[in-house]
Amino acid sequence: DVLKQIIEGYGYKTKVLEESIALAYEGLVDNDLTGIAISMGAGMCNICVMYQGMSSLSFSVARGGDWIDQNVANDCGCPVAKVTAVKENSSQLDLTKSAINDIYQEGSEEYNIINAIRSYYGALVNYLLTNLTHQFNNAESVPNFPDKVPVVFGGGTALVKGFMEVVGEQFNQEEFPIPVKDFTLVEDAHTAVARGCLSEAQLIEEEEGETKEE
């Protein structure tokens, strides 16, 4: 691995840490590192089920923000860059609003893009939760969670206004294999994974320091 060689060339030790596990270290710290962490990336979404600091299940789904952008662009007949700009910058985009609440005139390009983004966000969240349920049901070993668990989200794709409300609408507790306490967006979601990596690095450094003292 080229990046590993570069880092180690500067005298650092490297450790591979999955994106969703790093997010769990940051987002589940107030719940005894127990719960579900979902990192909503551009190319894919990464999921980790953690129990008391140990990852019991982790996987990825090959859909993310880019999947939304590409499908909206195809449906609306516009460049992907235009869709991305609307998704990331439009003050009118709110996933909780219906089409009739838009100030844009029906049929305008902006109007069509915003409503297509809403539709594909709902499809992405539904796909994500369906896959998570499937992974739970087919896993050989899943912890027996004694209490309801939190689900934390991070990553740029989760930053669109109204995203957490869409998650709540798509979620069906009766069909989900474990009880869920709540859904939250981790603070400063863009840097949450990096902070989780830092926490793990600091912990390793402390443990190595204690070993040397012994």
What are these regions (language model features)?
Residues 1-37, 51-60, 65-84, 88-123, ...:
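Nucleotide/phosphate-binding catalytic cleft detector across ATP-hydrolyzing
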Residues 40-42:
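A generic beta-sheet turn/junction motif
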Residues 45-49:
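Short beta-strand scaffold segments in enzyme catalytic cores
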